[in-house]
Amino acid sequence: GQGKDKLVGGRGIIGCDGVSWCFDPGIFIDDDGTTYVTWGGGESNSRPNTDNFDIVKLNDAKDAPVGNGSHVKVNNLPTRKMLEASYIHKHKGTYYFSYSTGWQQGAPTIDYGTSNNVMGPYTWKGTILGDPSMNGRSINGNNNHHGIAEFKGHSYVVYHDRRIAKGHNGLEIIPADDGKAKPNEGYHRSVSVDEMFYNADGTIQTVKVTDEGPAQIENFDPYDWYPALTSSKQKGIRSRSNFVQGKAADHVLLPLSSKESWLRVSGVDFGTAATG
């Protein structure tokens, strides 16, 4: 939703602690309301790619750390090491620390470890998401970022790929803003989502990348108001966000042509009103 609090600008909340890439903050709020932030990536002389993430607990105002940050330890790491995109979520009392592996060891994946303590140490368990591919062909690039959420009894992983920039399965390639006929694939990432499933022992099944995305879990109510961005499929339409400092972002839809531009919603329940 729209943020209401002012951003804390002009200063950091904690140092980088020798981490090479001091970026990709991941925010986790525990059941008791306590907030934690993870960050990091890359590799430095003091922080190799087996020890390149930090975690810190924030105060109640969420604008300063409580104590010093600590290294996120992941035991039993395989050949694929940690690159970036740290993220924590919790499921049935267990903490899951996930991250993107590096392209240096092959196609990047989203791997994870588990712990009974949010600060760790974690034990590596497996891969949540392989390199997004379809029909044996990668639809991604040299990295990935993700988020995990539970919604109405279902678990979902949101991630990025380059399926639109690559024109996967006939998808419409939207021209870059600079007028080029085809954008640079590496810098045009598409946001995708698929359902995620747990095994009985709490481990996560490797997510199947799909064209369709998750199944619809509720009917669409046509008698409510929705942003025009809401659709299950669209053609010839680009969504844009106009950002003005100090104001809420204005989201707009722009047709790419004067005809044959459309959007669709699915699973609509008209009830008895449509038939009288």
Give residue ranges: language-model regions:
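Carbohydrate-active catalytic/glycan-binding domains of CAZyme proteins
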Residues: 1-276
